[in-house]
Amino acid sequence: MKRFAVQDHELVPEHILLTPEEAQQVLMQYGVEARHLPKIHVTDPVAKEIGAKVGDIIKIKRKSPTAKESIFYRLVID
């Protein structure tokens, strides 16, 4: 049986696991601590698919009718 890839679904926005360096750069750019970011659970299907671990930061790119693309960041929690 073929395994279903969550990210291949048209309604799921692109999720990118940031490296520690990229994550630190994002936090410095916005002047926030990781704990202040919106959260995503480590058990979320996309988080599991991309191999995210607790404490990682995920960049989410969503298509937007007005801005063409919106970028969000999520902290992976337990």
UniProtKB/Swiss-Prot annotation:
One GO location term (cellular component): DNA-directed RNA polymerase complex
Keyword set includes Transcription: yes
EC number: 2.7.7.6
InterPro entries (alphabetical): Arch_Rpo5/euc_Rpb5, RNA_pol_subH/Rpb5_C, RNA_pol_subH/Rpb5_CS, RPB5-like_sf
Subcellular location: Cytoplasm
Reactions that this protein is recorded to catalyse: RNA(n) + a ribonucleoside 5'-triphosphate = RNA(n+1) + diphosphate
Family of the protein in this entry: Belongs to the archaeal Rpo5/eukaryotic RPB5 RNA polymerase subunit family.
Role noted for this protein: DNA-dependent RNA polymerase (RNAP) catalyzes the transcription of DNA into RNA using the four ribonucleoside triphosphates as substrates.
Protein name: DNA-directed RNA polymerase subunit Rpo5
Name of the gene this protein is made from: rpo5
